[in-house]
Amino acid sequence: MRMKGFIAGICILAVLSATDAAAQKRLTIIHVNDTHSHLEPERAGEEAGLGGVIERAAYRDSVVKADGKRNVLMLHAGDFNQGTSYYSVLNGDLEVELINAMGYDCITLGNHEFDNGVEDLARRLAKIKCPVVCANYDFSNLEAGRYIRPYTIIKKAGMKIGIIGLMPDITILVPREVSSQIPAFNNAEVVNRWASFLKDEKGCDLVIALTHIGFEGEPYTDPMLVGRVRNVDIVVGGHSHTFLSEPAFISDLDGKKVPVVQDGCWGLNVGNMKVMR
């Protein structure tokens, strides 16, 4: 299975004494996106033999063994559904079981999670054991809203980590009978509101935007988002199937360089970001 590693330092002191260095907090973020029901290694083409949920689990185990479970944060940036017969035949239930078995700490939703309708999405979300985050759509009048929150807070590696979720523009990606039931909020406005809340009121050490809006393409991208917000430390993205071999550092409203990562598609790669604070 092809792997890659991201190393990013967030808020590292310019000068560390020996005591400071020993006390430094180290977090590992494992992330995937757009796995699209690809549960087995690819069978043909340039990617033959790559991917597979068993292989992803083995990689997870190796990272947890090396870094310690309490120091590893696992994220999925959406579109875990649709793309193989596992989804079309089993209606997305197997993917939910595997999300739970993999032990993700948090996920966001992609447009393909809605392919069987919002009612069936609610049925599947009821079985997911980790937080599901989405801040830029209002699900409050739907059954699915019981299982979706704008943000979550997770403690790992001695850090308090706030995670905000974003979905893509479903008005152009999802049937109107579905999208018309789910009012949208402005992406930058909701991220600024929740990021400020997480930093200032909840005392989060780190704020992550877990997005499915794409690194490139139309009508909105992660780089565009970063340029319009503050208080976000990392963007873990999906949707455009972009493979970033290293983080793209984008300036936010305050000129801070924010690392943006995305890991291709189909689970061919597993992102590994090291965060030191």
Regions found by a protein language model. Give the residues of each.
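Acidic, metal/ion-coordinating pockets
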Residues: 22-277
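Bacterial Sec-dependent N-terminal signal peptides
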Residues: 1-25
